[in-house]
């Protein structure tokens, strides 16, 4: 019998109809007719937040397996959360590859140990790791602990072991890290902010009062002008950049870009102007001069809301590149003259007519008068007509009904003048009246997903949570310390909110030391380590080089790739007695002792460092909160267990710390009280829950808290606090981080809220997550209205006065002072004003000044040849000698990110490694033609510190600029390669970069240095 294929299936189906096979769905006709099931139907959905950049995109993670025995959950799909106000379901190429990151073959599963001189890892147990690390730390602490300094002052510090803290770990991990390190007396505590956005805090806080992004991602849509300078938002923050495009498409906004390269952001801009790397201050000072000369500023705003009218001391001055008070030997200023003339009551003298020759307004005019369009062109290489066109665009937003939003990132921060780059733009925004406005602001686009939060929590050498300062050895007792850090108003009647410093500090000490902190022992003041100088990462690696450091803990950080002068970093790590890495991934730092040929040429047998490689969980494997660039604290949930026996950072820190406590309790040693009195009273001490830690960070009442005016109880004993306004300085409140007060209230976890309603249409989704401070979305929003309370632009009205209080579409960033009261909108400042003149808050001057990069292609400073580079920037002797000169290294090198990669992480993720598999550098067409370099050639890029090899991408995107009579060519160097990961092996870009940083924060000068390039 002959049958067709179709007939055959019919016969088979009929014969199977009553069989078990048919019951299981194997009958072809049944299978063919069945509707295909939705592949996510049987999965578990978990909400999380992207671990990469600071946009803070919402995620939906899907896993199979219900967590029962033999059914371990495994995440197999991740997509954007469509309900999230910022990303609305979208993800960038990095976020699209998150599953490959979670399941990377580079994920660590077991603790491992590398013995001194060994060339291999050996697997050990957690008990062995914790016991050995605790033993090494205690031995080092007991041998090198400094209880008193040479003057006999109690300092209780430990300098010979340090800790490098993470950039993407949760706030709860960060808070535990702060307690862990300070309980041991550590001062060498630093995080990713030191090498990225440290200058943001150092510039925005002196200018406005707080060192954070002033607005938020969605608010960018309200701008009439978006200026991207010192960053490449389309590449580095693509989903956040959609809001700039939203402004263009739906608000008619113009987008302008000023950058050494024609970037992906420039590709969609309305106008692009080139600039020589490292000359932003000259360019922006020229903009200031243009605004002043053409009266393109908001006069009423400037007079009422800035310190333009305040009178500066007669002995302040500036001449030939230096402000008054400079000490060339110390490379520091005596800043005593950088302040106001005071009246008999201690308030600043003022001339509201702006006629006094010593008022800030006239000193500013005098200072920027040198930055004419011709001077800008000569220094920056920007054609004069292009510069003036940018000025015109910016000047238009001085109108009351227009705003400009300025977006910047590491292109501004990673210079030896990084903080002053940002301050110059902040001054422009004050003149334009764009601060506090919807669609305005100075918007720092943070690089890492929680670098904002970890900075908020004070994981820096001289910091404490909430931007408080760790005591110095000059502050010998609590009262001296509080007096030094509690400012007095400089104008009558101002809020001066830092005047509440004692409440913030005492409440933090109660969170740290609990019942052990009492008024009698000054709330445990002497248990905090006291610093003599900053122990930032550049300082600390210099100490390593000198043999003064024995131990180092790297938590979620890869300094071999991330720090300047890779060869110096390798040499420093080789001098340690022990190194502990805590990371989900295998990193170059954990393997610094391995020989990888010219990528890392070392002799393992000569490196005597004991190395511990401890596997930690990643973002998808723990609960917790992180803070995006817009200050939103967003809670995320665990979607799966970590591979192998990896632990959370909190469990790892607890494992080490609890062993140290046990040893100090049983054996004694150097200042056991400092270690034993730190609270660690979690329900499961070796496994603190994120929820417990978040509640501790928020704070609670330790006794009934009463209203000072009425005596009524406003918070009952044991209850969570709802606001930092409830904090007290008498020990009756506990709060680990005062700016996070309100994040976990009696009503529950505010960070987990998911109401994305936006009734104003301005993007202020007050019911989504929680923003510090007190859920305010736009900082300084009282400045959105004039002194009488009328909005500058009714379409952007944020606040209104209802007769008794301020209300509106945002939480008022202000007191209850009524319109016309004269209380300024910058409530953290002593004057209540934004500062055009920064007083003594900046290292190199109260006004910004153009200084050349330490490796300048010009060899001089056209403004003042005797003061070429930042005179207040610190540089060590050997690093100064390692600086290159333009005769041997004639081109400007600058490093940057690609949209397909995230720093040194995504080379471990297969999808991203496929998208950008091979290391390359960008060379302008004219230079390539001159050097005989063609597309795809292998080239060697060298500085005075080392070299890398990469493929050449010859491009029109980088042009030759003319500055001070010289042709200036730039070499673009993406940073993402190394000798670990699934991507093709490559050189570490920071082999090339100089070991010098911003004068205020020591953030390295990655964006402008000298190189040579040659065809291999």
From Swiss-Prot:
Binding locations of [4Fe-4S] cluster: 50, 53, 57, 92
SMART domains recorded: Molybdop_Fe4S4 (SM00926)
Entry EC number(s): 1.17.1.9
Domain annotation 4Fe-4S Mo/W bis-MGD-type: ranges: 43-106
Free-text description of this protein's post-translational modifications in UniProt: Exported by the Tat system. The position of the signal peptide cleavage has not been experimentally proven.
Localization (cell): Periplasm
Cofactor(s) demanded: Mo-bis(molybdopterin guanine dinucleotide); [4Fe-4S] cluster
EC main group: oxidoreductase
Stretch forming the signal peptide: 1-33
Function of the protein: Allows to use formate as major electron donor during aerobic respiration. Subunit alpha possibly forms the active site.
Binding partners and assembly: Formate dehydrogenase is a membrane-bound complex, formed by subunits alpha, beta and gamma.
Protein family: Belongs to the prokaryotic molybdopterin-containing oxidoreductase family.
Protein name: Formate dehydrogenase-O major subunit
Species for this entry: Escherichia coli (strain K12)
Lineage: Bacteria, Pseudomonadati, Pseudomonadota, Gammaproteobacteria, Enterobacterales
């Amino acid at each position: 019998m002959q049958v067709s294929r179709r007939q055959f299936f019919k016969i088979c189906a009929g014969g199977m109809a009553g069989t078990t096979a048919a019951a299981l769905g194997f009958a072809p006709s049944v299978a063919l007719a069945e509707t295909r099931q939705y592949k996510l139907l049987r999965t578990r959905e978990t909400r999380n937040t992207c671990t990469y950049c600071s946009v803070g995109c919402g995620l939906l993670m899907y896993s199979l397996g219900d967590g029962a025995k033999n059914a371990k959950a495994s995440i197999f799909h991740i997509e954007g959360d469509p309900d999230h106000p910022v990303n609305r379901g979208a993800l960038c190429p990095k976020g699209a590859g998150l599953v490959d990151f979670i399941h990377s073959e580079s994920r660590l599963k077991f603790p491992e140990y590398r013995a001194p001189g060994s060339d291999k890892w050996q697997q050990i147990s957690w008990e062995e790791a914790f016991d050995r690390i605790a033993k090494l730390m205690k031995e080092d602490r007991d041998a090198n602990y400094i209880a008193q300094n040479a003057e006999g002052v109690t300092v209780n510090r430990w300098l010979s072991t340090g800790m490098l803290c993470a950039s993407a770990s949760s706030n709860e991990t960060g808070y535990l890290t702060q307690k862990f390190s300070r309980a041991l007396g550590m001062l060498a505590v630093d995080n990713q902010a030191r090498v990225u956005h440290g200058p943001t805090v150092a510039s925005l806080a002196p200018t406005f009062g707080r060192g954070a992004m002033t607005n938020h991602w969605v608010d960018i849509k309200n701008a009439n002008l978006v200026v991207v300078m010192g960053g490449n938002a389309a590449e580095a923050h693509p989903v956040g950049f959609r809001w700039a495009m939203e402004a263009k498409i739906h608000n008619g906004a113009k987008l302008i870009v000023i950058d050494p390269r024609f970037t992906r952001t420039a590709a969609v801009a309305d106008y692009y102007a080139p600039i020589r790397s490292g000359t932003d201050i000259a360019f922006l000072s020229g903009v200031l001069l243009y605004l002043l000369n053409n009266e393109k500023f908001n006069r009423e705003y400037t007079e009422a809301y800035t310190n333009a009218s305040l009178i500066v001391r007669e002995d302040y001055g500036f001449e030939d590149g230096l402000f008054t008070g400079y000490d060339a030997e110390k490379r520091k200023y005596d800043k005593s003259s950088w302040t106001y003339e005071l009246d008999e009551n201690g308030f600043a003298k003022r001339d509201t007519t702006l006629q006094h020759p010593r008022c800030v307004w006239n000193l500013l005019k005098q200072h920027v008068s040198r930055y004419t369009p011709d001077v800008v062109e000569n220094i920056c290489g920007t054609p004069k007509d292009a510069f003036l066109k940018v000025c015109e665009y910016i000047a238009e937003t001085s109108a009351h009904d227009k705003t400009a939003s300025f977006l910047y990132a590491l292109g501004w921060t990673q210079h030896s003048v990084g903080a002053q780059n940002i301050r110059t733009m902040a001054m422009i925004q004050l003149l334009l009246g764009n601060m506090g406005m919807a669609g305005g602001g100075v918007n720092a686009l943070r690089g890492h997903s929680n670098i904002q939060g970890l900075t908020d929590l004070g994981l820096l050498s001289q910091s404490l949570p909430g931007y408080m300062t760790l005591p110095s050895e000059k502050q010998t007792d609590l009262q001296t310390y509080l007096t030094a850090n509690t400012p007095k108003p400089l104008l009558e009647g101002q809020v001066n909110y830092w005047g509440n410093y004692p409440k913030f500090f005492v409440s933090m000490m109660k969170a740290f030391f609990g019942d052990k902190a009492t008024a009698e022992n000054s709330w445990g003041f002497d248990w905090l380590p006291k610093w003599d100088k900053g122990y930032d990462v550049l300082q600390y690696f210099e100490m390593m080089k000198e043999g003064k450091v024995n131990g180092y803990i790297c938590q979620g950080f890869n300094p071999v790739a991330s720090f300047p002068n890779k060869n110096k970093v390798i040499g420093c790590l080789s001098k340690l007695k022990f190194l502990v890495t805590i990371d989900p991934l295998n990193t170059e730092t954990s393997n610094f002792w391995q020989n990888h040929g010219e990528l890392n040429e070392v002799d393992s047998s000569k490196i005597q460092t004991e190395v511990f490689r401890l596997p930690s969980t990643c973002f998808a494997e723990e609960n917790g909160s992180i803070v995006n660039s817009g200050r939103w604290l967003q809670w995320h949930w665990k979607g799966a267990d970590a591979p192998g026996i990896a632990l959370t950072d909190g469990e790892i820190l607890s494992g080490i710390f609890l062993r140290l406590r046990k040893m100090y309790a049983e054996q004694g040693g150097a200042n056991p009280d400092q270690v034993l009195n730190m609270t660690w009273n979690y329900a499961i001490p070796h496994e603190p829950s994120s929820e417990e830690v978040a509640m501790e960070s928020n704070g609670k009442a330790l006794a009934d808290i009463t209203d000072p005016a009425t005596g009524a109880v406003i918070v009952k004993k044991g209850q969570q606090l709802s606001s930092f306004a409830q904090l007290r300085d008498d020990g009756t409140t506990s709060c680990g981080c005062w700016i996070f007060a309100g994040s976990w209230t009696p009503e529950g976890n505010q960070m987990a809220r998911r109401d994305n309603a936006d009734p104003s249409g301005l993007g202020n989704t007050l019911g989504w997550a929680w923003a510090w401070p007190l859920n305010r979305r736009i900082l300084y929003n009282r400045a959105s209205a004039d002194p009488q309370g009328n909005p500058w632009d009714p379409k952007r009205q944020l606040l209104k006065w209802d007769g008794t209080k301020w209300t509106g579409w945002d939480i008022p960033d202000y007191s209850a002072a009524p319109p016309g009261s004269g209380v300024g909108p910058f409530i953290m400042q002593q004057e209540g004003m934004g500062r055009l003149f920064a007083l003594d808050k900046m290292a190199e001057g109260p006004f910004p000044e153009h200084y050349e990069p330490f490796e300048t292609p010009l060899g001089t400073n056209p403004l003042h040849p005797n003061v070429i580079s930042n005179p207040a920037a610190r540089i060590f002797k050997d690093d100064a000698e390692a600086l290159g000169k333009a005769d041997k290294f004639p081109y400007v090198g600058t490093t940057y990110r690609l949209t397909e990669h995230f720093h040194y992480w995504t080379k471990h993720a297969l999808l991203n490694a496929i998208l950008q598999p091979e290391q390359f550098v960008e060379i302008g067409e004219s230079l390539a033609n001159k050097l005989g370099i063609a597309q795809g050639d292998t080239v060697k890029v060298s500085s005075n510190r080392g070299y890398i090899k990469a493929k050449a991408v010859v491009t029109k995107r980088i042009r030759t600029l003319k500055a001070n009579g010289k042709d200036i060519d730039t070499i673009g160097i993406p940073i993402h390669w190394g000798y670990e990961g699934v991507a093709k092996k490559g050189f570490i870009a920071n082999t090339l970069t100089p070991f010098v940083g911003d004068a205020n924060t020591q953030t390295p000068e990655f964006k402008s240095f000298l190189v040579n390039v040659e065809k291999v």
